[in-house]
Amino acid sequence: MSLDPSSFPRSNSPASSDSSLTRSRLRGKEGSLKKDKNYRRYASSVERALSLFDNTLQEWADYISFLSRLLKALQTHPPDQPVVPHKVLVAKRLSQSMNPSLPSGVHQKALEVYTYIFNLIKPEGLSHDLPLYYPGIAPTLTFASLTVRPLFLSLVETYVCDLEPWAIRPALKAIILSLLPGLEEETSDDFDSTLRLLNTLREIASRMDTQRPGAETNSSGQYFWQCFFLASITSPSRRLGILAYLNRYLPKLGVTDRRPSRHEEVDATAMPLEMQVAVDSVILPEPGLLIRCFATGLTDEQVLVQRNFLDLLVTHLPLSSPILQTRITKDDLQRLIVAAAGVVSRRDMSLNRRLWAWLLGPDPVGDRASFEARPSISSTASKTAAESEELSQSQYFSRFGLQPLASGLLQLLKRDTELPSEKAKPFRITLSLMDRWEVGGHVVPAVFLPFMRSVKAYKLAAPKAHFDEVFRSATSFFDGVESGMIFSELLNLIDWDAKSLANDAPRILDNLNLAHFILDHFNVREEDMVLNHAPLLTLAALIKMSELSSEATTSVAHDQLQAVSNGLSKVVTLLTGLLIDRAFLRKSDSKNSVNEPSMLLDRPGSAILRQIHQFYDRSRNSLDLQPPPFPPTDLADLIIKNVYEQAISAVNACNDAKSIPERLNLLIVVLKKLPRSRILRDKRLYVAIGKHIQASTVELSTASFSHLSSMSTTITSLYCIHKLGYYITYEEVSDLIPPLVRQLWQFLSPLSPKFHVEAVRCLWNLHSVSWSDHLVESTITSLMFTPPAPGSYQLSSEEEAGRYFILWNHSHHGTYELPPKNLQDSAQSQASYHSSMLERPLFTVLDLLSQGSTQPAQVVQLWLQDLPSVAKVFRIIISKLEGVLHRGNQLGTFEGNTVVSPDDYAECNYLFETIHNVLGALNHNGWVSLLTQTMAHNSRRHDASASEDNAEAPSLHSVVFQASLKIVSGYKSGTATANAEEVKLQQISLLVMRQLLLGPGVEELVESGIDSLLVDRLYSMLDEGGDIAIQAALIDTLLAVLKARFSQAYLPPPPTKPKHQRGGSREKLTSPSLLSFTSDKPEKSSVLLPSPEPPQRLLDCLLKGLSSPRSRAIIDKWIMLLCEILPIYSTCIFQILLTLVDCLGREIRQSYTNLQSAFEKTEGWPKDRPEQTTISLLTGFETCIAAAHERLLMEEVNAPAAKSPDQTHGFFGNMVSGVFASDSNHPRSAAMNNRLTVLLSFQDAVRLCFSIWSWGAAERSSLPQDTESIASFQYTSLRMRNRSRRILEHLFTAEALECLETMVDMWIKSDRDTSPLIFNLLHTLDGSRPKIAIPAIFNAIYTRTNPAALDPSRKSTMTTALTETELAGFLVTYARSLDDDVLDEIWIDCTTFLRDVLSNPFPHRQILPRLVEFAAILGVKLENTNFGEDRRMRKELGDVILRLLTAIFTSKPMGFTQEQGLLGRASLDYDSSSIQRIGPDDMLSILVASMPAFSMTLGDMDRITTAVSNISTNIIGPFIRARLFPNNLNTSFMALMQHISKIPQVAKVWKKDVADAFNDPRFFGSQLDLVKGGWMTLLRQWALVDKDRLSEIMTRLTPPATAGIMFGVGASAARLDADRKAQLNLRRISLLVLSTAEDYFIAEMPALLQKLEDLLGATASSSPSSATRAEIFMVLRALILKSTTTTLSPFWPLINSELQEAISAISSGNQQELYNPYSLLQACKLLDTLLVLAPDDFQLLEWLYVTDTVDAIYPPEQFEPTALADEVSHNLGVRWSTSSDPTRESTNLHHGVRYPGLAADWIRETAKDEIVDRVLRPFFDQLSIHAFESTYSISNPNLEACRDDLLADLFNESTMAN
């Protein structure tokens, strides 16, 4: 076997140097023998032999030679001196010779030397030196060859077993662990020898037990068994050997061949004496160790181990054993039974069979296969009798296992764990346990509800992904539970004792919420559930619901009662969704049902509930299917009767706003889902609803409307369910509809938009069942007719007309379906259905127009002017007119007229008057509708694109004209006497014709001066108060006067428009004199004519009228006045603009606030027409700004242009003109002031419109508090959003740059909720599409960076205080928000801009980093679209990015700025809208965000390398070399480094940067969070790329040297320098090992071990000195955390010897030259880490440091602990320092996790001279007890805490030589 000589480390420490181990027991008699000449000669020969280990070992044969020399030297001992000189070093070298990597020949020779030494020192010497020698041979069986194993076993048997029991006692657990590998294979040659050895140890241990107080002399090895169980708990790798021994020698701890009888008591004292003695030997003094031995074995990773432990349970430890039932704690039994149940997760049948055998007990006597002869008849009879007394399997489990298993599962459920797999474990275990009904049938009822509560609570606390994983397991569990059990538990949840309601309402509510959660989240729709259980549970819930409204609940607080009622209602809603008619149509198979259904229906609810409970109780206690408690048909009647009675009670009581809608809706749902029932035949509900409607007065509140809405729905639904008129007849419906319509009509008040949509929906609902009889129409018509006052004639009031307008508008906006097919008359069309409700009331409304200038007539006129569906009004009138004309054609010729019968004169006259009145009310849009719409519904005539069919259909305009033409042309002029009616008919017909032919005319000029008088009158009325109608009349008159007076002064030539361009939305309220909202400049030739002076007080009057509350009802009139008079003020509009804008803005905000509050309040909301007021004011606002802007354009066009001397050519000179041409070329000072005034108004308008637009935005989820009016809210908010968006569209079209700057300013000051809305708006508006917005941002930036180079027409006026950095931040965020597809629109603009910037980068130096980010965003979008497939574009962008980086590094070198805290800013926050959080100079954050795009965009490897090299040279390098390093680094720097390290081709670049940083002496001053989150990942990558990193660092570690300067001035400084270098390199090694994968540096381990050996030879005066010992211990900690058992095995001799020396030095105080306090602390931390992790090989050494057996808790009499920790604690004493014991705080177990005890931060801050007193003394006090408790708790080590503590120590610079 060839070996690499270099792989075996040797120490360079001189062999003659005596060990510093000061423990007297290991020193023996050497001190007194040193004067003996023979001994000195003997010791010298041993020393010479030992020196060979350091100098001559090159290959494995040298080891044998060394061992032979050592043996010969030992054989020269004087006969009278049986001692071993330098025995500590001898033991260490022998231990190193037992290295597993050496061949077996070396091991044999080493064991030969051990044998000689043991023989030499005799048992007396070995008893004292066992801690010295045994650790060296303890691991032998884990690696020994077949030839070595017998030698080891013989050595133990001959010498170790021969020692005194007191010497073996501390090491017994370690000896057992060392022997157990020999039992793993029962067929091996060493198996019997090992078994014999263990039995010998058990016999020796029984002699030890007699030393314990109260122990029996025949206790049969209590101490052995306790150590044996501990070995099983702590060492999973040795459990196969443990099982082999337990199977043979573990006593039976209970009766395993039969189950106890029903009356047999389980008592430990009833066991036979022999069994009691055996039991005591196993479980005393600590029974918990036996349980933990089994519990850990049952949770082992190997199936074989689990299977064998289950076998042991079945054969040796039955569930009925008195030990389990009486001798151990309940928690321990829970632990054992849950561990056993946990094997089901393996889904292994062999495991499950054994588990069932243990949980259910032995098979019955008759079932067991017997190997004996057939029993006799008499014995069979006696056995049968015994059998009948035996517990059944189900009873056995229920008695012995149910309670601990259920409690254990619930305890498992309550564990606080972050892992969803652990949270789901109880569900999976229980699901598998349900495979056996004997177990699952008992367990599931005990855990079902707690499991469901746990899932519900977990949903609220856990992330969605975690909850989903747990919920999948919970769903599987739920689906496995029997339906009857589930609904039985649900029944218990919703059923409560009526007496407990007042005192226990929170618990009842919690149960209801849980029931709702189960029904809502789990599958309760299985066939059995919906057919058998859901109806019963629904009935029970309905009974409980009726109880809540009974008199018994009067003592319960109202809010509690309401909460319980709401919870129960939610449950009932879900339950009714489970009802299906099939469940009630089945044949009855019930045997115990009541004979008469009437008797059943009359039974009280409590009796029915009791019967349901009895049904579920019978089902639970019987395996047979139980008959249902009620026949299906009776059950349906019971449900319907309950709901029916509650509905009647709710309607009669009407004391709860919600109860009526809930109960009525519930009734309808139930009736629809259940078969027909005769319960409702008594008509009590019909009578109750009728009384309620007749008795109640209309109150405008949410509750009142909710009642009406639900009743109207109930009536129509009852009429239509199953078949028409089954539950309620048509006559009964006809009786209820009129009063309902009368009450619903009140909710259509025009004073508030609340409930409009809902009320109209209810009216159409009622109309759908009664339309053939026109019930709703006739009722509405009757409501519109009001009794006239004396001496007057009034058809309808203004208020009633307003209600009808709302009905009309929402009837045409909403989509109301046709009635059910069985209600339709085939001859009737959809049109007749709609008109059958709207026609008669329409004529009633239009009749008001005939009243001339009265207020109602004006209201109707205003309605018609704004009516989009005015064509439908004409269709209804014309259809009537055509009917009259058609009758005339059929009847023939009449006297005086050939068209109309004299009998129809009145009707025809009436219809023409109506048409005349409607035409008189039309506005421009109305005329357009008249010209384009036809009589056919939903058709429109198009001038150019209409089809031929449509073109042939005459327009409404044409139809009316033809009808009037018919009347006129049919008149006979030759009659003698003219009928007055006929003359009137002619007059009205001609009038209609004239209207159609002329359209709106121009009023004649009026006398001057009347306008001032009217203004004064209007002003005084506003002051003094007066009728609104007079105000309106005055305004109309004034408008007419002003129009006539000023029309010629401001009428320009008509603008040219496209042929089919549609008019703007604002034109309908403005004079045609106003210019349209456009940014196109007027022609220069247009001459500004002088205007007459307006009346003096006109403006003041206007402002007063707009802001007066008295004018709200006619606000439209005031706005019209404003719009019409604006041209009068064209010359001075800039002086009055801000005043107007301020007034209008204030009023808009007030009105808008009122509108918002209307939808938030449920009562007492504002009723001042806020909706219409806001719309009207917005129109005036828009018109004002439009007029001012158009006047500004005209003035700028006519101003003399100043020539610009130098025009730049480039992006800003060449961009397509006309986008922002609204600026003048070179405005004068006055013009600049005018422009500023207009732009300030624009800003106000943008901010105001945005606030309105964002009201109903879905992103804000700002639903009104009153959900009853949600539809109206959505309609109103959408209308507001559309209006404000149109204004914004116009504003952006006119002044895109200024509006965009305003939006940027709002974005900067906005919060996180508002910021996305700003971008949503920009994406919505056509005027701010990317093609316009991106160049505008460029213009805004260039205006601030280099305005001289910008074309003057493109400059911003800078009315908003924005900086270029804020604009650049907005540019980046806006670009990121754009869709990838818009790239082709903005590509040329963006690249031209970037190139333009690069041509002169200095002015833009502040925003260059932002432009890099912008270019990177373009790169990402380029990759995501087909547009980016052009390589030329990618190359172009790559060039720009490279040039930008160069420009940044040239204009602003990072080295100059980074030390000034450049990177102290927070990193880039993409989602933040606050510019303050986005540092424009934070180049690192920008590069982090952009690096992924760089690698895609740059494409070519040379370019990527160039970019990374630039970044490395200009950013990374300066940071690493900076004076502030490493404090100047942050997460952005680390993220940038990690991004670069993922690009494999540039490894050469970043490797150097990492190496520079890592080798910098200041590196270990880095922040810990950066190390964990950044450097460790980088170092892992670095080690993968450069595999020689560790070797290279190790070459810098020089062995300690004593030559050179020993004294003098420079000696101390040189030594300190050498110490610091060694410490740094050792820390680098530790960090590299920690950062890489486990065993990554396995090849370098031998060399590292040699380096550590060399450094451990240092003294206080060497160079480097012994000050490096602390870092050596850190390296060992890192190795323990990151190495496997095999890799670590050569290090244990070194670890053991050094750790013992260091800990011994703590109490001795004479080793200060070798161990400073910090070295001692690190040694203790190494021990702490070993105790937490407990590696297998350390368990063989653990007894040297702590008492690792039960003696730590139960010490025998006169016990003197030999463990180091106990000795140190004894020597230091138990006195405390002034501080408390903080170290022990962190050693506590946190939820079953072991934490290191020395990891607290305060320990690192403890002064050097206080470490022993404040830190180490408390640490060693009771360390053995704490170590034993952590083992006993079966806790898992917290590797993360150990790693973090080591990192904190590594990066603690205060402990290094300085």
Swiss-Prot record:
Keywords: Golgi apparatus, Membrane, Protein transport, Repeat, Transport. Residues 1-23 have a biased composition (Low complexity). It comes from the Eukaryota. Residues 1070-1079 have a biased composition (Polar residues). Residues 1-33, 1052-1092 are annotated as: Disordered. Signal peptide: none annotated. SUPFAM superfamilies: ARM repeat (SSF48371). It is a peripheral membrane protein. It holds the Pfam family Dopey_N. Residues 1838-1854 are annotated as: Transactivation. GO terms for cellular component: cytosol; endosome; Golgi membrane; trans-Golgi network. Its main location: Golgi. The keyword Repeat applies. It is found in: Golgi apparatus membrane. One of its GO terms (biological process) is conidium formation. Involved in cellular morphogenesis. Required for traffic between late Golgi and early endosomes, and for the normal structure and organization of the endoplasmic reticulum. During the vegetative phase, contributes to the highly polarized hyphal growth. Required for the reproductive cycle. Involved in conidiophore initiation and differentiation. May have a role in controlling the balance between vegetative proliferation and developmental morphogenesis. Belongs to the DOP1 family. This is Protein dop1. It comes from Emericella nidulans (strain FGSC A4 / ATCC 38163 / CBS 112.46 / NRRL 194 / M139) (Aspergillus nidulans). The lineage of its organism: Eukaryota, Fungi, Dikarya, Ascomycota, Pezizomycotina.
